[in-house]
């Protein structure tokens, strides 16, 4: 997949430089639709994704990567391309009402639609000649094109005391209730954790608070129906789509 990126530089006058970026791989993710995806990486530790590198990349290209616990993954918000971009956006952390400049947020509606996620590296392997990089804590849509991968270096990049603007701490988690109570018994522990952790993040638009509404999303091949009332997620049904 070739991506046309246009960059503007200012010298004596404006001129345009065009540079083609070739994606290096693609993401396999339990999230096949945007609704329900964690808004940030590491919020759902059970969200395991796999990055499959293109055939031209051998194990030599990732030699030494397994020595790092976390990696930066640069990717394309491919599902937002048709929606364009805006200078001002409404961050969910501000209730979806107050606007901020796009460069002060992590909105997918950016000029070049490029995203950046910090993922926990699980392991690297080679299956049928294709390099696969398995990560935990994913926040990426299935089929996302990957542009670059770099190791996370804590002593350089970790700044826990840095100001964080309008973002104050981790979001509050919702409590989970299964109805009927024996519903999760039909699921594996991994699938149950993934569904619970994903819905505890409250995937609804920030401006939406309709306790009587039943929502639906698809997670790891399951159609999940739920409603949210008084900081509780009530999971009503989980149906396999396979």
Residue ranges and their predicted role:
Residues 129-152, 240-242:
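Short solvent-exposed strand/turn elements
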Residues 229-242:
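Enriched for short, Lys/Arg-rich terminal
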Residues 18-23, 109-118, 220:
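Short coil-to-beta-strand transition motifs
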Residues 62-115, 207-211:
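Active-site-adjacent substructure of cysteine-protease-like catalytic cores
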Residues 28, 119-122:
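Conserved positions in beta-strands of structured domains
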Residues 17-60, 65-67, 152-198, 206, ...:
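Arg/Lys-rich, positively charged N-terminal/basic patches that mediate binding to nucleic acids
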Residues 32, 124-130:
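Short, conserved beta-turn/loop elements at beta-strand boundaries and strand-helix junctions
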């Amino acid at each position: 997949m070739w991506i046309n990126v246009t960059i503007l530089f200012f010298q004596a006058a404006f001129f345009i430089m065009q540079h083609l970026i070739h994606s290096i791989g693609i993401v396999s993710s339990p999230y096949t639709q945007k609704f329900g995806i964690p808004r940030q990486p590491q919020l759902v530790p059970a969200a395991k994704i796999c990055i499959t590198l293109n055939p031209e990349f051998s194990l030599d290209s990732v030699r030494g990567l397994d020595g790092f616990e976390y990696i930066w993954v640069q990717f394309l918000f491919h599902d937002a391309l048709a929606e364009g971009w805006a200078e001002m956006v409404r961050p969910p952390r501000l209730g979806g009402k107050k606007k901020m400049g796009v460069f002060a947020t992590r909105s997918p509606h950016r000029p070049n639609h490029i995203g950046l996620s910090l993922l926990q590296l699980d392991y690297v392997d080679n299956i049928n000649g294709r390099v696969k990089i398995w990560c935990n804590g994913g926040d990426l849509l299935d089929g996302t094109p990957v542009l670059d991968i770099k190791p996370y270096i804590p002593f350089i990049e970790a700044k826990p005391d840095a100001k964080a603007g309008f973002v104050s701490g981790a979001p509050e988690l919702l409590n989970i209730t299964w109805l009927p109570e024996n519903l999760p018994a039909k699921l594996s522990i991994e699938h149950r954790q993934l569904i619970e952790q994903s819905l505890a993040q409250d995937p609804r638009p920030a401006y939406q608070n309709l306790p009587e509404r039943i929502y639906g999303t698809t997670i790891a091949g399951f159609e999940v129906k739920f409603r949210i009332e008084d900081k509780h997620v009530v999971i009503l049904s989980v149906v396999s789509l396979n």
